[in-house]
Amino acid sequence: MLRTLSTSEFAEAIGISESSARRLADSGELRIRKTKGGHRKIPAAEAIRYAREIKATVVRPDLLGLSTNVIGNQPIEADSRSQRLLTALTEGHYAEVIGLLQALYISGVSIAEMCDGPIRFAMNAIGSAWPQDKRSIFIEHRATILCVRALSFLSSWLAELHPPPPFLRSFHDSSMSYTHT
């Protein structure tokens, strides 16, 4: 089941007033679902889409289901993105890798830009440590696994934000089920 937020949770997550959140929902700028009782519910994926679109500072990432490890009130400086990712990958800190990539995505960086920028820089730096550092092969393999896991996590996250069109849904659903005969 997909996580939903009340208007007060959404407002707290991005640091706006609850009345502003209700106005956004009522004006259609924010896609919502209404409960049988008439309460506005905002899918977490929609809250993330909106925060990214307006480049909002995410004050409470935990309310959006995001990592609290890196995302916070401070934007990530462009120069430090690659270095922070390199450190997280080298030290094997998966939660920090996820948090950094989530923070980059929320700030408007595309997956392609992440791969061509900070991920490429980090993987090149890790790969160039060999043959001087014999541990570098292990570190490179672990970093590759962490990147694949983090990007896989982000792709599942993006699937919520941008579900496949109806004509592909049945194909996608059927291709994911395996049966033994």
Model-based region annotation:
Residues 24:
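Residues in the recognition helix of alpha-helical DNA-binding motifs
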Residues 8, 72, 170-174:
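Short, contiguous strand/loop micro-motifs
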Residues 156-181:
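Conserved mid-sequence domains
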Residues 3, 16, 96, 121, ...:
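Residue-level preference for nonpolar/small residues embedded in alpha-helices
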Residues 20, 29, 33, 37-160:
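Long amphipathic alpha-helical segments
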Residues 1-20:
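Polyanion-binding surface elements
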Residues 12, 91, 174-178:
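Residue-level marker of alpha-helix boundaries and capping positions
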